[in-house]
C-alpha cells in the first residue's frame, strides 16, 4: 500500500513535466513531416528514415500523454528547472533520428552532435559534402535551428526571468509571471512573438531569393539567420556567396534582427516606436558592432584589401560571431593576429536577452561595468551610497549576485571543458576555442581543425560528447543545469 502511494505521488509530481514534453514531442513530429513531404515528392529514399523517426516520436508522445492526460499542468519552480533541461535534451535526441536512419547514416555520436548543435542554434557541424545531401535533410537542418530559435526566445522571455537565472530578473515582464491571472497575457505575448519570428523568416526568405539564392537555400538560410544558428547548405557556409555582396549585407541585417529583444519588436508594433533605440542592451550591442567593424575594416584596408570588400566581409563575420550565428564568408582566422584575437574575444559576447542569440549576453557586460564603476566610487567615497540603474531599473543585490554567479560559472565551464578537451589530445587553440564556441553557442572555433574553414568531424567521439554537454549548458544559461546537480534541489 505504501509503495503504491509512493508511486502515485511520484507520478503526480512528474506528470506535468511529462505532459508538457508530450506536447513538445508532438510539435517536433509535425515539423518532421515537412521534410518528409519534400522527400516523398522528390522520391528520395530518406523518406523512410523520416517516416520511422516520426513514428518513434509520436509513440513516445502518445505514451506520455496517456499516462498523464488526467493530471492538470501546474508547474512549480523545481518542475520548471527540470522541464527546461529535459525538453532540450529529449528534443535534441529525437531530432537526431533522421540523421541516423537517413542517407548520411551518421554514427550515434555524430548524429547527436549535429542535432544538439542545431537545436541549441550553435551551428558547429560534422557533416561534409553538405551540397550532396537530399533537399529534405537540408531542410531538416534548417527547421531544427528554427525550432531551437523559438525555444530560446520563449525561454528568455518567459522562463529564465521567472527562475531568476543569471540576473535575468532584470527582464521580468508579464510574460514571466506564471500566475493564473497573468497566463492569458503570457499567451498573447507568445503568439505575438511567434508571429514576428515567422514574419521575419518570410521576409528573409524573400530577400535571399530575390538576392540570388535558390528557393531551398533561401528558405534554409532565412530560418538559420533569424535563429542565429548558422547552418548553411554548403561546406563553405556563406563563403558560397562571397562574390554576391548583397547577400552578405542581407545576412548581416537578418542576423542582427535575430539578436535583438523580441519583446521590443512587440512594443514597437504597439506604438512605442523608440523602444528599440532606447534600450540599453540594443545601444550597447550596436555600439560594440560599430566600433569593432570600424577597427577591423581599417585593419584590413591597411593590409591591402579593397575598402568595400573589407567593409562587407568584416561586417558580415563580426555580426555573425557577436550574434553567435556562426556563418563564415571568409576564413577570418587567416586575417592576422589582431583579427584572430578580436574574434576570440567576440565569441563570448552574444546578443541581447530575449533574442535567439547565445553567449554571455551584452547586458551582463554592461552590468559588470556598472558594478566596477560603483566599486571605484566606493574606494573614493567610502561612506557614499550609490544605486546603479539599468534600463531605468535599480540593480538590486538579487540581480547583481545572479550576474556575478553566472559570469563566474560561465568561464569556469569554458575552462573545465577546455581542460577536458586537451586531455583528449586536442591542441591548445582547438581545445580553448572549441570550449568557448560550444558554451557560447557560436559555431566555428579557431585554428585549422575547427576554424571557419574547418569542421568538427575529425574530433574524437569523446570530445564531441563533451562539446554537446557544453552546448546544452551554454544554451540553458549554465545555472539552470547546475542547480539540478545539487542535493539541496532534490531534497526540496
From Swiss-Prot:
It is a multi-pass membrane protein. The keyword Endoplasmic reticulum does not apply. InterPro entries: Cat_transpt (IPR003445), TrkH (IPR004772). Pfam families: TrkH. GO terms for molecular function: potassium:chloride symporter activity. GO terms for cellular component: plasma membrane. The chain crosses the membrane at residues 20-40, 47-67, 81-101, 143-163, 196-216, 246-266, 282-302, 334-354, 403-423, 465-485. PANTHER family: TRK SYSTEM POTASSIUM UPTAKE PROTEIN, TRK SYSTEM POTASSIUM UPTAKE PROTEIN TRKG-RELATED. Belongs to the TrkH potassium transport family. Medium-affinity potassium transport system. Probably interacts with Trk system potassium uptake protein TrkA. Main K(+) transporter in osmotically adapted cells. This is Trk system potassium uptake protein TrkI. It comes from Halomonas elongata (strain ATCC 33173 / DSM 2581 / NBRC 15536 / NCIMB 2198 / 1H9).
Amino acid at each position: 500500500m505504501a509503495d503504491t502511494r509512493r508511486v502515485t505521488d511520484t507520478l503526480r509530481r512528474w506528470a506535468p513535466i511529462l505532459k508538457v514534453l508530450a506536447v513538445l514531442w508532438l510539435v517536433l513530429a509535425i515539423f518532421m513531416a515537412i521534410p518528409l513531404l519534400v522527400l516523398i515528392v522528390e522520391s528520395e529514399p530518406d523518406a523512410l528514415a523520416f517516416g520511422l523517426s516520426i513514428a518513434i516520436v509520436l509513440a513516445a508522445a502518445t505514451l506520455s500523454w496517456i499516462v498523464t492526460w488526467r493530471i492538470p499542468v501546474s508547474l512549480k519552480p523545481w518542475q520548471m528547472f527540470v522541464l527546461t533541461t529535459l525538453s532540450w535534451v529529449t528534443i535534441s535526441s529525437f531530432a537526431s533520428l533522421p540523421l541516423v536512419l537517413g542517407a548520411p547514416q551518421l554514427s550515434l555520436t555524430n548524429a547527436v552532435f549535429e542535432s544538439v548543435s542545431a537545436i541549441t542554434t550553435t551551428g558547429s557541424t560534422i557533416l561534409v559534402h553538405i551540397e550532396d545531401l537530399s533537399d529534405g535533410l537540408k531542410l531538416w537542418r534548417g527547421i531544427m535551428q528554427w525550432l531551437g530559435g523559438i525555444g530560446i526566445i520563449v525561454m528568455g522571455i518567459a522562463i529564465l526571468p521567472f527562475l531568476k537565472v543569471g540576473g535575468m530578473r532584470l527582464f521580468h515582464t508579464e510574460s514571466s509571471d506564471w500566475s493564473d491571472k497573468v497566463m492569458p497575457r503570457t499567451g498573447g505575448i507568445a503568439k505575438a512573438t511567434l508571429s514576428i519570428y515567422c514574419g521575419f523568416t518570410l521576409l528573409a526568405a524573400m530577400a535571399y531569393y530575390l538576392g540570388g539564392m535558390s528557393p531551398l537555400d533561401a528558405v534554409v538560410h532565412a530560418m538559420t539567420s533569424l535563429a542565429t544558428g548558422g547552418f548553411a547548405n554548403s561546406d563553405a557556409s556563406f563563403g558560397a556567396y562571397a562574390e554576391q555582396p548583397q547577400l552578405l549585407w542581407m545576412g548581416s541585417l537578418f542576423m542582427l534582427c535575430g539578436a535583438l529583444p523580441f519583446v521590443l519588436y512587440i512594443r514597437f508594433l504597439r506604438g512605442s516606436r523608440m523602444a528599440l533605440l532606447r534600450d540599453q542592451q540594443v545601444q550597447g550591442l550596436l555600439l560594440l558592432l560599430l566600433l569593432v567593424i570600424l577597427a577591423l575594416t581599417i585593419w584590413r584596408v591597411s593590409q591591402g584589401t579593397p575598402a568595400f570588400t573589407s567593409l562587407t566581409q568584416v561586417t558580415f563575420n563580426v555580426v555573425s560571431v557577436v550574434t553567435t550565428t556562426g556563418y563564415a564568408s571568409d576564413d577570418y582566422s587567416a586575417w592576422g593576429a589582431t583579427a584572430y584575437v578580436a574574434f576570440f574575444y567576440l565569441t563570448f559576447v552574444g546578443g541581447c536577452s530575449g533574442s535567439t542569440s547565445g553567449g554571455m549576453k551584452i547586458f551582463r557586460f554592461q552590468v559588470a561595468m556598472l558594478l566596477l564603476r560603483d566599486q571605484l566610487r566606493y574606494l573614493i567615497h567610502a561612506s557614499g551610497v550609490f544605486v546603479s540603474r539599468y534600463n531605468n531599473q535599480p540593480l538590486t543585490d538579487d540581480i547583481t549576485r545572479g550576474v556575478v554567479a553566472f559570469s563566474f560559472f560561465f568561464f569556469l565551464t569554458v575552462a573545465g571543458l577546455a581542460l577536458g578537451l586537451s586531455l583528449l589530445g586536442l591542441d591548445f587553440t582547438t581545445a580553448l576555442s572549441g570550449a568557448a564556441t560550444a558554451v557560447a553557442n557560436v559555431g566555428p572555433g579557431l585554428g585549422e581543425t575547427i576554424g571557419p574553414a574547418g569542421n568538427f568531424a575529425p574530433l574524437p567521439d569523446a570530445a564531441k560528447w563533451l562539446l554537446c554537454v557544453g552546448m546544452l549548458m551554454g544554451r540553458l544559461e549554465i545555472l539552470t543545469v547546475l542547480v539540478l546537480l545539487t542535493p539541496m534541489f532534490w531534497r526540496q
